[in-house]
Amino acid sequence: MKIVKESLAGTFESSDLLVKVAPADGKLTVVINSEVIKQFGHQIKQVVNDTLKELGVQEGTIIVDDKGALDCVIRARVQSAVLRATDGQQIEWEKL
């Protein structure tokens, strides 16, 4: 999927996260800010990267501000932000 505009998904509430997505040419940059980065940073990065790979995102800037969200919430917020930022092409729901 190609990211063509900026988008947001989520909140700053406890047990949630805010995902910001923006277009970027040629590279994929993922920035993760979390209150629990020392304990769960590797797992958060893994879930975000796996979700982006499943969606076919190869370039863009992804900023994740985590407040202790579970994996399923991370996945859902990343999916929502990316889908809002795409060019409206047909979504392949079976990949999600």
UniProtKB/Swiss-Prot annotation:
Subcellular location: Cytoplasm
InterPro entries reported in the protein's UniProt record: CitD, Mal_deCO2ase/Cit_lyase_ACP
Entry keyword set: Cytoplasm, Phosphoprotein
Key word Thylakoid present: no
Keyword Zinc-finger: no
Gene Ontology CC: cytoplasm
In-chain residues carrying the UniProt-annotated modification O-(phosphoribosyl dephospho-coenzyme A)serine: S14
Listed Pfam families: ACP
Family from the record: Belongs to the CitD family.
Function: Covalent carrier of the coenzyme of citrate lyase.
Subunit-structure text: Oligomer with a subunit composition of (alpha,beta,gamma)6.
The protein's name: Citrate lyase acyl carrier protein
Organism, as annotated: Pectobacterium atrosepticum (strain SCRI 1043 / ATCC BAA-672)
Classification of source organism: Bacteria, Pseudomonadati, Pseudomonadota, Gammaproteobacteria, Enterobacterales
Gene assigned in the entry: citD
